[in-house]
Design a protein with these regions (language model features):
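Terminal, non-globular segments
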Residues: 1-213
Length: 213
């Protein structure tokens, strides 16, 4: 049952925010379109990963690929939320971190093993940028949808940091490993729920603003 929850149920919930985003796409700002493509790529890669898993084929190379796309799309999402100087800095961090991911996959950690170094660095970057959003963006410039989405990302990457950092030391099939993956899957559910609410909130806020213009 735990295997089904971790491998199928939790990843499949990404379809909820994707469905809402498709319906609301025309009204979404550029920042949320980065989130939309983040969801699409996550769904596609997770779907292929599930198929490979059932064929007993190592699907970890897909995780290396997913990390690369996650960093690019999420950091470009964040770059839309900050003023110019911070936005440019976030983009520089994005490309440096992508270079590290490439180096990690080619020389440090095999694509057939869990890329814990890259995932750990990714988690740290997203955590720091999320905190920077709450600290540096003026309250009047924060939108309800971005607050929901950034909160979800902060929760997910903060909660998953331990998993990314120590995954290679958690033996497969060990009780602790199963518990950690269960917690991670639960956080994924919360992330997708908050993104869904954020996309819905964006539509409502934009509609309200338009009606008074």
């Amino acid at each position: 049952m735990s295997h089904i929850f971790i491998g199928i149920i939790a990843p499949s919930t990404v379809l909820i925010p994707i469905g809402v985003a498709i319906y609301k796409y025309a009204r979404m700002p550029l920042s949320l379109r980065y989130i939309f493509f983040y969801l699409i790529i996550s769904a596609c890669i997770n779907f292929v990963a599930i198929l490979l898993s059932y064929q007993s084929i190592n699907n970890l190379p897909l995780l290396h690929l997913l990390t690369f796309f996650e960093l690019f799309l999420l950091l470009y999402y964040f770059s839309c939320l900050f003023e110019y100087k911070i936005s440019i800095t976030v983009k520089y961090v994005c490309w440096v971190s992508l270079l590290f991911c490439l180096v990690n996959s080619l020389w440090l950690q095999s694509i057939f093993s869990f890329n814990s170094y890259a995932r750990g660095i990714e988690a740290i970057i997203i955590i720091l940028v999320s905190l920077l959003y709450f600290v540096r963006v003026p309250e009047k410039q924060k939108t309800p949808w971005d607050i929901l989405i950034v909160s979800g990302l902060l929760l997910y990457y903060a909660g998953s940091f331990f998993l990314y950092l120590f995954s290679n030391f958690l033996k497969k099939g060990h009780r602790l490993s199963t518990m950690v993956w269960d917690v991670n899957a639960s956080i994924v559910l919360i992330l997708y729920l908050l993104i869904t609410l954020g996309i819905i909130k964006c539509k409502r806020q934009m509609t309200t603003s338009t009606s008074f213009s």
